């Protein structure tokens, strides 16, 4: 992590991102307090780039959730790999499989789960918690914003077939908003 506000400026500068002292202060405090970093501004001012630079400096994985109108929880958290599940069903049928309970348990396991950005950000990583960039939040609708608030308040999501998945270490969250969409 960063040791001071000057350290934020210096290390980000080494990665090609020059930031003001005010922005460096906000970044430093956000990390020290373990709170999300909320950045708003016009398109092209570097809101997304700071997340990339921070990931490079901190050696963390960057996970980006690009927001758009109509984005829903299933697109942001997870979905099931239906084609692979269908192949497994057909294979079990062809092999004369009769244990439907075992097949159902297998079909709704990690093997067939496609992790989307929010779920991916809650997975353990050897380099520490990832940086979760929620980009252009202003493009989403209120129901998704409410869902996101709930998911990020406890850093956990519930998948009905698997149960609740909680981040062992909360991700570093950066939210961006473009003034042009307000």
Regions found by a protein language model. Give the residues of each.
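Dynamic helix-loop-helix/coil hinge segments at AAA+ ATPase domain boundaries and subdomain interfaces
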Residues: 2-23
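Conserved small/polar residues in nucleotide/adenosyl-binding loops
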Residues: 180-182
């Amino acid at each position: 992590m960063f040791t001071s506000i000057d350290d934020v400026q210096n290390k980000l500068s080494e990665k090609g991102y020059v930031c003001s002292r005010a922005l460096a202060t906000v970044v430093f405090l956000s990390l020290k307090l373990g709170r999300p970093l909320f950045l708003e501004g016009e398109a092209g001012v570097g809101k997304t780039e700071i997340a990339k630079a921070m990931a490079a400096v901190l050696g963390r994985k960057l996970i980006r959730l690009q927001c758009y109108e109509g984005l829903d929880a299933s697109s942001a958290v997870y979905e099931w790999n239906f084609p692979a599940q269908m192949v497994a069903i057909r294979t079990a049928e062809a092999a004369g499989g009769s244990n439907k309970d075992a097949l159902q348990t297998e079909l709704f396991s990690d093997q067939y789960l496609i992790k989307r950005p929010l779920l991916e950000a809650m997975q353990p990583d050897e380099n520490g918690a990832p940086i979760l960039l929620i980009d252009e939040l202003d493009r989403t609708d209120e129901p998704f914003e409410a869902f996101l608030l709930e998911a990020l308040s406890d850093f956990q999501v519930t998948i009905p077939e698997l149960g609740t998945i909680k981040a062992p270490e909360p991700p570093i969250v950066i939210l961006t908003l473009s003034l042009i969409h307000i």
